[in-house]
């Protein structure tokens, strides 16, 4: 059969498998590819290549497949630490997750931890695959496990009562030992993923935002700010705000340039220079953002989930405590901040992931799910994500 051309006609969605070690995440990933993609065996997925994201090495396996309605990119990580790092750094963006729970064991510590992480990093939706159902003869026991999973999801503010839970067996699907628990269950799972996990809004449809990387003064024309448009569209003549570091100011974009050509607009993904009216070279700086008025506010205090690098990863050699003062690298710039650890957490060791409060010394254009690096003198020692804004 000739290899079919990749059609961009279907909406694209990024998902991943999460859950406790040995509950069957990788087997399920293999089973999905068997019916919806180019089959990848367990060993091919398990031998995940290492990648670097924000200075952190993470092993992740990527597979792709498609249903009648969508094209999926699916990420599976071999180790628990890889999951933690992946979710916090956003190395593989997740528009939704498939939580794999072994029916024979029920929810376990990493089940809980992955659900909490999904909540902290803002994974929009979860679908559950209750795996290894061929190992459980007792229907009441299955119901009990399902109830436990629903309660756990609700505890972490996911809609536990409405989340689809599909019962099946990834191994049965791979070995064709039971059509009902195997192929049928996998097809039901993907139907649930198709209908329950929302299609993400494309970056171009979101409100305009461009992190400012550089500022130039062009004699006779004014001030130009350059950067890569993160989302949305900016048209010549539109009003925008400059947010972060200093008081928010309004200005008008009087020109957009790309590769030395004048355009009438810049859009998500473009590297542009924007000419702005009535703003002096000294009034704007790297680290601020240009955005649609009112869409983003500057903040200094937030709650974050962070992963702290190990010594082997090039991180710190020693723990840190409350009042630790590193730099937080947001988009294009470092800002010093003070860390407050949660009650009961005395210190954070290299290799830990931690929920913490941060107070920056100057405000930054910020919203939930914004990611950052934690640095000491230009060296990355951690990665984090804004889980909620305090003020």
UniProtKB/Swiss-Prot annotation:
Pfam families: GTP_EFTU, GTP_EFTU_D2, GTP_EFTU_D3. One of its GO terms (cellular component) is cytosol. Residues 10-201 form the tr-type G domain. GTP binds at residues 19-26, 76-80, 131-134. Keywords: Cytoplasm, Elongation factor, GTP-binding, Hydrolase, Magnesium, Metal-binding, Nucleotide-binding, Protein biosynthesis. Its main location: cytoplasm. InterPro entries: EF-Tu_GTP-bd, EF-Tu_GTPase, EFTu-like_2, EFTU_2, G_TR_CS, P-loop_NTPase, Small_GTP-bd, T_Tr_GTP-bd_dom. Mg(2+) binds at residue 26. It is found in: Cytoplasm. It catalyses: GTP + H2O = GDP + phosphate + H(+). Residues 19-26 are annotated as: G1. Gene3D superfamilies: P-loop containing nucleotide triphosphate hydrolases, Translation factors. It is an enzyme of class 3 (hydrolase). GO terms for molecular function: GTP binding; GTPase activity; guanosine tetraphosphate binding; translation elongation factor activity. Residues 76-79 are annotated as: G3. Its EC number is 3.6.5.3. Monomer. HAMAP family: EF_Tu_B. GTP hydrolase that promotes the GTP-dependent binding of aminoacyl-tRNA to the A-site of ribosomes during protein biosynthesis. This is Elongation factor Tu. The gene is tuf1.
């Amino acid at each position: 059969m000739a290899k079919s051309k990749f059609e961009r006609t279907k909406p694209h969605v990024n998902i991943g498998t999460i859950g406790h070690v040995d509950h069957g995440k990788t087997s399920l990933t293999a089973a999905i590819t068997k019916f919806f993609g180019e089959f990848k065996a367990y060993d091919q997925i398990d031998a995940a290549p290492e990648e670097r994201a924000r200075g952190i090495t993470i092993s992740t396996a990527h597979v792709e497949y498609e249903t009648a309605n969508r094209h999926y990119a699916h990420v599976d990580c071999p180790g628990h630490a890889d999951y933690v790092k992946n979710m916090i750094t956003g190395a593989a963006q997740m528009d939704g997750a498939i939580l794999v729970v072994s029916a024979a064991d029920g929810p376990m510590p990493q089940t809980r931890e992955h659900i909490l992480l999904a909540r902290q990093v803002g994974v929009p939706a979860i679908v559950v695959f209750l795996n290894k159902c061929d190992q459980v003869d007792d229907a009441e026991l299955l119901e009990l496990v399902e109830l436990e999973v629903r309660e756990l999801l609700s505890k972490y503010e996911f809609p536990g009562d409405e989340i689809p839970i599909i019962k099946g067996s990834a191994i049965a699907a791979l070995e064709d030992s039971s059509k009902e628990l195997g192929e049928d269950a996998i097809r039901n799972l993907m139907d649930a993923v198709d209908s329950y996990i929302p299609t993400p809004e494309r970056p171009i449809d979101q409100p305009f935002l461009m992190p400012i990387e550089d500022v130039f003064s062009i004699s006779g024309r004014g001030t130009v700010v350059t950067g890569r448009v993160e989302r949305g569209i900016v048209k010549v003549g539109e009003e925008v705000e400059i947010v972060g570091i200093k008081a928010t100011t309004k200005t008008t974009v009087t020109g957009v340039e790309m590769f030395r050509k004048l355009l009438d607009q810049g859009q998500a993904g473009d590297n542009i220079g924007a000419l702005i009216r009535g703003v002096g070279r000294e009034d704007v700086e790297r680290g601020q953002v240009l955005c649609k008025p009112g869409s983003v506010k500057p903040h200094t205090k937030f709650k974050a989930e962070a992963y702290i690098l190990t010594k082997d990863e090039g991180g710190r050699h020693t723990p840190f405590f409350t009042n630790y003062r590193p730099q937080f690298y947001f988009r294009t710039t470092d800002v010093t901040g003070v860390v407050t650890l949660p009650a009961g957490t005395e210190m954070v060791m290299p290799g830990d992931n931690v929920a913490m409060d941060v107070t920056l010394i100057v405000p930054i254009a910020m919203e939930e799910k914004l990611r950052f690096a934690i640095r000491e003198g230009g060296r990355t020692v951690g990665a984090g994500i804004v889980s909620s804004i305090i003020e």
